[in-house]
Amino acid sequence: MSTPDNRSVNFFSLFRRGQHYSKTWPLEKRLAPVFVENRVIKMTCYAIRFMPPIAVFTLCWQIALGGQLGPAVATALFALSLPMQGLWWLGKRSVTPLPPAILNWFYDVRGKLQESGQVLAPVEGKPDYQALADTLKRAFKQLDKTFLDDL
């Protein structure tokens, strides 16, 4: 579920973790007031889709109109960095340990899943947001929506 030592994460593995976290996190409207992940994931997916063409267009447009190459490249690099910033943030968030209030709720949701007959892997170390995302995804598939009433 989570890595035993969340602090020793490679810089480039954060992008991979961020992509995995964005695919794991359930994009439910009832989670949006509590967790910022819904907005960050939507904006990151938007940036992954539209920023590369915008960067190419900006670069070609400034060069075609006789602009300088330096600002054109800087603008293109900034546009290309936006999706990477979103994935990096999601990767950092996925390995962040849960705060105490959310940790109690995490264990409540796990308890409800186990009461419904689901077999869950034991939690190793202190649970992080990736463990929460895995648990919430499974809870939305297996349980009714009333498990969110305690949130």
Swiss-Prot record:
Source taxon at top rank: Bacteria
Where is it localised? Cell inner membrane
Arranged from A to Z, the UniProt key words for this protein are: Cell inner membrane, Cell membrane, Membrane, Transmembrane, Transmembrane helix
Its record classes its membrane topology as: Multi-pass membrane protein
What the entry lists under InterPro entries is as follows: UPF0208
Q: Which Pfam families match?
A: DUF412
Gene Ontology cellular component terms for the protein in this record: plasma membrane
Q: What is its main location?
A: membrane
Q: Does the keyword Transmembrane apply?
A: yes
Give TM regions: 46-65, 69-91
Query: Which family is it part of?
Result: Belongs to the UPF0208 family.
What's the name of the protein? UPF0208 membrane protein YfbV
Q: Quick one: which gene encodes this? A: yfbV
